[in-house]
């Protein structure tokens, strides 16, 4: 379980790296393609779309498959961004990479929380934030070391390396018990939970998931959104949204 959570958290390195690597590459991309502000805008547009799609995708195909899609997307789109021959293709790849980032923002914390034992869940969830910061630092360091060479393609393409390593590691992981329970596959959920929790906590953990799923709000998307901002949690949610800006 710890291996699974650490593997997922490692995707934060790629996410953090993408945040900072464009700072070094920006002036050289502008020189070659004549674009500047659109570079970051394209990524942000993709991130918004990815963040919206992340939850439905994880529920539809599973947490593990979603993680594989994210890691593969990071790898492929980072490489295609680095080798783009034109501004149009470059921006298209930035949008697709942004979608991948948006997906990861939604899916990775869920995958970690559902794959970790209750006693270690908080610490392992924090690991994702730590790896994001590590990625940001690496982005600046790599950009600084390659800056004199004008090799912006290398600066952007290096992001594929950690993503590919995580992709290989994810193959060894399992689906989460919560997703199996969501799909009504309780026997598989029990087997998955037995790999995470000690024997005496397996059934209580499954009962907790069962109760959580039974209390999920039903109805339309707009109805669920209204419920999110109803009652005592509205102020906290508004604060979190404003903090993001």
Which positions does each model-derived feature cover?
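Transmembrane-helix signature of 12-pass secondary carriers
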Residues: 1-245
């Amino acid at each position: 379980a710890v291996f699974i959570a650490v593997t997922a958290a490692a995707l934060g390195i790629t996410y953090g790296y993408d945040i900072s690597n464009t700072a070094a590459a920006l002036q050289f991309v502008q020189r070659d393609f004549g674009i500047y502000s659109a570079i970051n805008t394209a990524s942000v547009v993709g991130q918004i779309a990815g963040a919206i799609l992340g939850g439905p995708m994880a529920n539809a195909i599973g947490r593990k498959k979603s993680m594989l899609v994210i890691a593969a997307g990071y790898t492929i789109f980072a490489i295609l961004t680095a080798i783009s021959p034109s501004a149009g293709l470059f921006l298209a790849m930035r949008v697709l990479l942004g979608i991948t980032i948006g997906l990861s923002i939604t899916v990775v914390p869920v995958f970690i929380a559902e794959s970790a034992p209750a006693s270690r869940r908080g610490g392992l969830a924090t690991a994702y934030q730590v790896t994001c910061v590590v990625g940001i630092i690496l982005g600046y360091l790599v950009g600084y070391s390659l800056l004199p060479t004008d090799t912006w393609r290398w600066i952007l393409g290096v992001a594929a390396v950690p993503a590919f390593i995580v992709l290989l590691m994810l193959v060894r992981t399992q689906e989460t018990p919560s997703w199996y329970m969501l799909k009504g596959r309780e026997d598989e959920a029990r087997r998955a939970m037995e790999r995470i929790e000690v024997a005496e906590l397996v059934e209580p953990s499954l009962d907790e998931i069962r109760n959580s799923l039974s209390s999920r709000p039903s109805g339309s998307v707009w109805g669920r959104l209204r419920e999110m901002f109803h009652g005592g949690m509205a102020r906290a949610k508004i604060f979190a949204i404003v903090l993001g800006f």
